[in-house]
From Swiss-Prot:
Cofactor: pyridoxal 5'-phosphate
PANTHER family listed in its UniProt record: D-SERINE DEHYDRATASE, THREONINE DEHYDRATASE, MITOCHONDRIAL-RELATED
Top-level enzyme category: lyase
Subunit-level organization: Monomer.
Pfam entry (one): PALP
Source species of the chain: Salmonella paratyphi B (strain ATCC BAA-1250 / SPB7)
Protein name: D-serine dehydratase
Gene3D superfamilies: 3.40.50.1100
Catalytic activity: D-serine = pyruvate + NH4(+)
Family: Belongs to the serine/threonine dehydratase family. DsdA subfamily.
Record-listed E.C. numbers: 4.3.1.18
NCBIfam families reported for this sequence: D_Ser_am_lyase (TIGR02035), PRK02991.1 (NF002823)
């Protein structure tokens, strides 16, 4: 306890985190892209290479997953305006939201219905390509739909993949790995929803369940993989490959905005609100957004009050050396995808200069907004996916933050607020009804 008091003396905001208060922290260490980029350790070239790899796999994906065929084997989500929800939020919170609110529907991404379809699928494909190239079975000029042949399935069946997950990452990696022909084991934490485990098993995936939280599931997955030279462990806490799979979203969003005639520049700032668990998904997306929009995009991470691992790590500068459990927080939240007690040290250190801030919100707030969005826009998401929805009113209410960045009323009026909806497209009807019943 005395250690917590010492921490609070140095970092006063920790007191609010411990008290489970909804908290907003604006990052005093935020820099320009030019200053912050060298610390990421990855470059625009790396993201372009990921983009090219996904293009090579597009013919394969279009055939393996017919729901991606219309988009030519690209796994991408829509961006939609949510004016009725914007009005509802203004009414509920008594706070005007300047500019326009949009929703990025990663919740409805093909194959696995969450943001994890980006990173998870990309890393499985990267590994498959590497094995096939090394074995001389494939060249990068081939039509990758050959990977659907029995010979390739046979080849990949010698190898296995393991991952630890609270649910959505396991879903994307499990479904993709099984499709390619890998043997796959997903180590699921206690928070994982029963339907996600059942769906994985229906694809022939081995699911190992733990009574403990995310950190334990990842650790056990890592251990199990170490003893088998043919097993590849996808490390959600440290993977650069996952991170790059998410980062591709930046250029793609830029193209979507261009198609819609939406301007992002100094006088039309873009604010993006990303739900954060261990940090790989939002970190990778934020990195891609920064490369695409430079200093005109402002990224915020959103976490449950019971799992504020990234806010705690970045704010104190302790990163993965501290967990929410260390300050007496239980890491129990309805936002199962965000139930992580210790943030990725790689993501925290890579992105701490490129984030404008982080905030926390209560489970009940997520349930309330889940209900409002369903009522106002007819869009149904899982609780985690609503974490970003609280962002716009926090930013619009923050005069000191606006002054520090020199935002004028005109700029704020021209702003775009993009809420990144991370999952929910595959939630079973009965489960969704239970979520909706919890909103006020």
């Amino acid at each position: 306890m005395e250690n917590i008091q010492k921490l609070i003396a140095r970092y006063p905001l920790v007191e609010d985190l411990v008290a489970l208060k909804e908290t907003t922290w604006f990052n005093p260490g935020a820099t320009s892209l030019a200053q912050g980029l060298p610390y990421v350790g990855l470059t625009e070239q790396d993201v372009n290479a990921a983009h090219d790899r996904l293009a090579r796999f597009a013919p394969y994906l279009a055939k393996a997953f017919p729901q991606t065929a219309a988009a030519g084997g690209m796994i991408e989500s829509d961006v939609v305006a949510i004016p009725a929800m914007q009005k509802r939020l203004e009414k509920e919170y008594g706070q005007t939201i300047d500019g326009e609110m949009l929703l990025k529907k990663d919740s409805h991404l093909a194959i696995s219905g969450s943001i994890k379809a980006r990173g998870g699928i990309y890393e499985v494909l990267t590994h498959a390509e590497k094995l096939a190239l090394e074995a001389g079975l494939l060249t990068t000029d081939d039509d990758y739909s050959v990977l659907l042949s029995p010979e390739f399935k046979q080849f990949f069946s010698q190898y296995s993949i393991a991952v630890g997950s609270t649910g959505n990452l396991g879903l994307s990696i499990g479904i993709m790995s099984a499709c390619i022909g890998f043997k796959v084991t997903v180590h699921m934490s206690a928070d994982a929803r029963a339907w996600k485990k059942a769906k994985l098993r229906s694809h022939g995936v081995t699911v190992v369940e733990y009574e403990d939280d995310y950190g334990v599931a990842v650790e056990q997955g890592r251990k199990a993989a170490q003893s088998d030279p043919n097993c590849f462990f996808i490390d959600d806490e440290n993977s650069r490959t996952l991170f790059l799979g998410y980062a591709v979203a930046g250029q793609r969003l830029k193209a979507q905005f261009a198609q819609q005639g939406r301007v992002v520049d100094a006088s039309h700032p873009l604010f993006v609100y990303l739900p954060c668990g261990v940090g790989g998904g939002p970190g990778g997306v934020a990195f891609g957004l920064k490369l695409a929009f430079g200093d005109n995009v402002h990224c915020f991470f959103a976490e449950p009050t019971h799992s504020p691992c990234m806010l705690l790590g970045v704010y104190t500068g302790l990163h993965d050396a501290i967990s929410v459990q260390d300050i007496g927080i239980d890491n129990l939240t309805a936002a199962d995808g965000l139930a992580v007690g210790r943030a990725s040290g790689f993501v925290g250190r890579a992105m701490e200069r490129l984030l404008d801030g982080l905030y926390t919100l209560d489970d009940q707030t997520m349930y309330d907004m889940l209900g409002w969005l369903a009522q106002e826009e007819g869009i149904r998401l899982e609780p985690s996916a609503l974490a970003g929805m609280a962002g716009p009113q926090r930013i619009c209410a923050a005069a000191a933050y606006q002054q520090r960045h020199g935002f004028s009323q005109t700029q704020l009026g021209n702003a775009t607020h993009l809420v990144w909806a991370t999952g929910g497209g595959m939630v079973p009807e009965d489960e969704m009804e239970q979520y909706l019943a919890k909103g006020r």
